[in-house]
Each structure stands twice: as structure tokens, then as C-alpha cells.
A protein has these predicted regions:
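Conserved catalytic core of the tyrosine transesterase superfamily
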Residues: 1-201
Length: 201
């Protein structure tokens, strides 16, 4: 996933796309949530965070990596026209990105990354796959299912169960590659005193 995020940043679109993909991976946000982020939703400071507007008008704030916060600062410096009420990641015309825009830009990023990482060409990388990667990363880092559900904005922790199952399946595949040692079962022979005691009962 990091290879996909590492898009060239020599153009305005490249800088926006890099920030877009970084925030998607950092937060695990839904596409609708990430394209709805406004400048006022970002808090940059000792502890930086972004406020996401999820399903059912529910809001949640998520911490940002220092690198992501730094990238947002640079982006805002390069785009002084962006006001508090402006979308953080606009199109060229200043309007908000659409789901189709995000899918298209992600597809382009994957195509660019495939030149250096051919294995990516075999994968179907989608916005939801980035969200899934965030969930799996949290799980493998030891985060419990309830906290992952809160992070992703799931209505119920039971929705997160599929990520736990996916991680278990991954571990089972790893275990299957390990051949168990060939230990021959030996017959247990109890001590004579134990046999006599059991016979006396």
C-alpha cells in the first residue's frame, strides 16, 4: 500500500493525490468521509487530528501521523485560497472530489506504482482495500476489535469481525506452511503404586 501512496508530487494534482491517499491510509476513512473533510475539520498542533463526518451524521476525530500533519501544513501553504469552510482536497475547479474522482486517481496511482512493483498489477486495489489495509494494520498491531470498530466508524463491533477472521485465516495459512515435528506417541505406563491404589477403589 505504501508503494501506491508514494505518487510523484511534482504537480498540484500529484501533491493532492499523495495527501488524499495518505489520509485514507492513516484514517481508514470511507471515500464519502475523506472527500467531505474541510479545512476546519483539521487540527494541527502537538497532537494533530482530523474530524470525519460519517454515516448518520456521526462524527469522530482520529489522530494523524506527524508526516500526514506536516503534509497538510505544506498543502495549505501552497493553497492559501483554501478557507476554513473549503474542502481540504478540492478538484482543480475548487469543487469537492467525487467518488469517481477518487477511484480514477487511485487507479492512476496504482498504474504508476506498478512500473516499479509489477506485483501490484495482479491486485484489484480499490478505496475499500485501503480501508481494509488500515483495519488489518490496526489488528496486527494488537488493537482490539472494539477499538477498531470505533476507529472505522462501524455501527457495531460485530462488523469488525470479518477483519479478525481474515487475520486468523492469514495465521492459519502461515501455520500450514510449518510442518509439525514427527513425535511418536508413547504409551503411558502408570507407576505400580498408582495401579494398586486405583484397583483398591
Amino acid at each position: 500500500m505504501l508503494a501506491v501512496i508514494d505518487v510523484p508530487t511534482t504537480t498540484w494534482l500529484g501533491q493532492r493525490d499523495h495527501l488524499l491517499l495518505t489520509l485514507m491510509f492513516n484514517t481508514g476513512a470511507r471515500v464519502s468521509e475523506i472527500i467531505g473533510v474541510r479545512v476546519a475539520d483539521v487540527v494541527l498542533g502537538t497532537t494533530s487530528c482530523v474530524r470525519l463526518h460519517g454515516k448518520g451524521r456521526k462524527q469522530r476525530s482520529l489522530p494523524l501521523w506527524k508526516e500526514a500533519a506536516r503534509e497538510i501544513r505544506d498543502w495549505l501553504s501552497l493553497n492559501p485560497q483554501l478557507e476554513a469552510g473549503s474542502v481540504l482536497l478540492p478538484r482543480r475547479d475548487g469543487g469537492p472530489m467525487t467518488r469517481a474522482n477518487v477511484t480514477q486517481r487511485l487507479r492512476l496511482a496504482v498504474a504508476t506504482a506498478t512500473a516499479c512493483h509489477p506485483e501490484l498489477g495482479k491486485l484489484s486495489v480499490s478505496p475499500h482495500m485501503i480501508r481494509h489495509s488500515t483495519a488489518m494494520g490496526l489488528l496486527q498491531a494488537g488493537t482490539n476489535a472494539t477499538d477498531i470498530a470505533l476507529w472505522l466508524g462501524h455501527e457495531s463491533p460485530s462488523t469488525t469481525h470479518m477483519y479478525v477472521e481474515a487475520d486468523l485465516a492469514m495465521k492459519e495459512r502461515t501455520l500450514a506452511r510449518l510442518k509439525p515435528p514427527e513425535v511418536r506417541a508413547t504409551r503411558y505406563r502408570p507407576p505400580k503404586r498408582l495401579v494398586q491404589f486405583l484397583q483398591s477403589l
